[in-house]
């Protein structure tokens, strides 16, 4: 968890430039468990994505910075200094790059996310097996969101043996988990975690304050294998 990451003026602009609700696609149905998560996303699969990124200078800057190979190398160097060594997959020749392009294999993922505070949640999961590292940048325009119960990210451990090795990212019932650490949803911070068989985490379920509904907005970024 890193605090006060951005220049205050840039972070304020980043919050202002966050895409409007109409551009988002509903991604709120958990088919496996027949539950509505009240989640909305906007990512590279949206036909408006590139246009949205390029129209706003702050979004363009953060996108280009995160998706640059140097950022990936810096993160790997930081992890290595802390005795965490991951396979870098960064020595790609021209042929490999062409094949990846043809197969639509991506090195990075970038998305805008919104979750309603009116009961919204993300069930406990470990992230897809194609991911190496996930980053979350909270977008906090209204400080009230920081006081919404369960608006942060909970780092969990499974209380049942059948969920303890979960590399393939099966969702886990909330009642089969125990909170190890709570990461608050505060402005101008970034936190990241490494995908493992037990990198279990969740959001919510959230509850409105004084009957007022907010959207928990974030920029999520992924480094893929």
What are these regions (language model features)?
Residues 1-84:
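Non-heme Fe(II)/2-oxoglutarate
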Residues 63-225:
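Catalytic core of non-heme Fe(II) oxygenases with the double-stranded beta-helix
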């Amino acid at each position: 968890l890193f605090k006060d990451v951005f220049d205050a003026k840039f972070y304020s602009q980043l919050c202002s430039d966050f895409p409007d609700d109409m551009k988002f696609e509903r991604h709120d149905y958990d088919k496996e468990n027949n539950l509505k998560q009240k989640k909305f996303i906007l990512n590279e699969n949206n036909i408006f994505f590139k246009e949205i990124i390029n129209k706003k200078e702050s979004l363009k800057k953060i996108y280009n910075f995160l998706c640059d190979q140097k950022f990936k190398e810096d993160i790997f160097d930081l992890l290595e200094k802390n005795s965490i060594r991951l396979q870098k997959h960064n020595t790609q020749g021209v042929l490999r790059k062409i094949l990846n392009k043809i197969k639509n294999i991506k090195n990075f993922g970038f998305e805008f996310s919104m979750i309603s505070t009116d009961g919204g949640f993300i069930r406990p999961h470990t992230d897809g097996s194609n991911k190496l590292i996930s980053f979350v940048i909270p977008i906090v325009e209204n400080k009230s969101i920081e006081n919404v119960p369960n608006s942060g990210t909970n780092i969990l451990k499974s209380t049942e043996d059948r969920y303890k090795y979960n590399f393939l990212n099966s969702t886990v019932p909330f009642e089969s988990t125990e909170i190890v650490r709570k990461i608050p949803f505060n402005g101008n911070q970034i936190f990241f975690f490494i995908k493992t068989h037990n990198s279990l985490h969740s959001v919510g379920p959230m509850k409105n304050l004084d009957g007022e509904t907010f959207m928990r907005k974030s920029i999520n970024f992924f480094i893929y294998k």
